[in-house]
Amino acid sequence: MASGREIKSKIKSVQNTRKVTRALEMVSASKIRKAQEQMKISRPYAQAMKQMIGHLAQANTDYLHPFLIAHKQVKRIGYIVISSDRGLAGGLNNNLFRKILGEMRQWQDKGVEVDIVTIGQKASVFFRRIKVNILGSVTHLGDTPRLEQLIGVIKVMLDAYTEEKLDRVYLVYNRFINTMVQKASFDQLLPLLAAKDKVAHHDWDYLYEPDAATVLEHVMTRYIESLVYQAMLENIASEHAARMVAMKAASDNANKLIGTLQLVYNKARQAAITQEISEIVGGAAAV
């Protein structure tokens, strides 16, 4: 059995760790509220854009934007992967990466090659380590990212699709469901899909000023950017929720461990006292 001093040292070490996990839990609880507000503010715009683009995909026009055209064969696909910059978020990032690898293997089994761009330090490090072809990367965007910071990596994928270097583009991120649930999501970005709402079967006629090509070029690009930005906000909220839950679990485990160590310490102290008493009694009897 370890000595009382060693056990006391272990208890002190676990208590110090508990202070850190409690602090991180409280910080994440505070940040998640702000992240949820940002996410909710952005959602209506993204949803309205999605509905409008779905209608444009069915509109009667002489000009068909490249983002609406499905390539005949799928030989190469691209993923925009969003992760966190920091760890201590439970299995949030690893679960996402595991699902991406499963999807990638399915495509590769069909002879389809895969390119990615990464948003977030964890994704960048992970995919560089396993030697996936990375077309672009951006990291350390913080808790309040700006759209301008994402435009570069988004443009890489849009240009590759327009030039037919990629045949499909997917957006991969953690969708925020609630504080306890975050879901790995795979959304098809390109080619754009037609609307599936109750008016999807209508034929839509739009008047474009100055012309269809100019309007659609701007609208389509803004739409893709809004989807990626919304996914980024969802992932940030998911990160803080996962970290809060993980740190609470760590704090609870620390409490249990401290309780167990305290019992061991009490038993060791009791055994030491009992031994001292026995030695005193034995010495007195010998006299």
From Swiss-Prot:
InterPro entries per UniProt: ATP_synth_F1_ATPase_gsu, ATP_synth_F1_gsu, ATP_synth_F1_gsu_CS
Cell compartment(s), UniProt: Cell inner membrane
GO molecular function, one term: ATP binding
Highest rank taxon of the organism: Bacteria
GO cellular component: plasma membrane; proton-transporting ATP synthase complex
Keyword field contains Transcription: no
Assigned keywords, A-Z: ATP synthesis, Cell inner membrane, Cell membrane, CF(1), Hydrogen ion transport, Ion transport, Membrane, Transport
Major site of localization recorded for this protein: membrane
Pfam family, one: ATP-synt
Bilayer disposition of the protein: Peripheral membrane protein
SUPFAM superfamilies xref list: ATP synthase (F1-ATPase), gamma subunit
Any GO BP annotation: proton motive force-driven plasma membrane ATP synthesis
Annotated family: Belongs to the ATPase gamma chain family.
Function: Produces ATP from ADP in the presence of a proton gradient across the membrane. The gamma chain is believed to be important in regulating ATPase activity and the flow of protons through the CF(0) complex.
PANTHER family: ATP SYNTHASE GAMMA CHAIN, ATP SYNTHASE SUBUNIT GAMMA, MITOCHONDRIAL
Oligomer and partners: F-type ATPases have 2 components, CF(1) - the catalytic core - and CF(0) - the membrane proton channel. CF(1) has five subunits: alpha(3), beta(3), gamma(1), delta(1), epsilon(1). CF(0) has three main subunits: a, b and c.
Protein name in UniProt: ATP synthase gamma chain
